[in-house]
Amino acid sequence: MGTSVRKMYDAELLQLDTMLARMGYAAGGAIESAMTALRTGDTELARSVIARDSEIDSAEHEIEHRCLTLFLRQQPVAGDLRKVSTALKMVTDIERIADQASDIAEITLHLHPDGARTVGVLDDLYAMGDIALHMVKDAIAAYVQVDLSTAAQVIARDDDCDAMFSRISKEIAAYIAAHPGDAETALDLFMIDKYLERLGDHAVNIAEWVEFLKTGVHKSRKIV
């Protein structure tokens, strides 16, 4: 690859980094807004989260197109291949993060506040939302900085997220058993619990791809 072509390729890789980081920040903002809407019952804020999801979907398609163009335009060397492969994998997780924020916002639109408080898990869901939000934000920061330490911290915190999911699920199941007439609201809260657990999983996925980007190793397998 000639010097001028290499410079152009590096500029395109840098632009890819910028696009992916911007999409990640937008997804993190969607989680934050969705959880604020849940706490406050702000239906306008919830609707804005839902409306912005299409923008993140568009960003996903643009990034995927750019990755494929980079693959086709040049024969990437190992480091470039890792960067483009990481972007292709991460963009899917980021898009799903935004989808789950939108799903939480959708539930908020029809969730009855008094009924939700009666189930008794809202404070735990708020706390779990904080954990999931920080995991996502830190995973994106780990990517931007190519920071293995931050990536490892995200992966380690997944145990806390999973433990909260399990405990909240059991509390909701016990409530439904005792109050079958209130099952609909309780099931809505269970779905929020599940979406938050998935947010943690997607943050871990991103962190693992950061490790791959830096080391060429993903999980237990050397790839590139």
Where do the protein language model's features map onto the residues?
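Cytosolic, long alpha-helical scaffolding segments
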Residues: 1-224
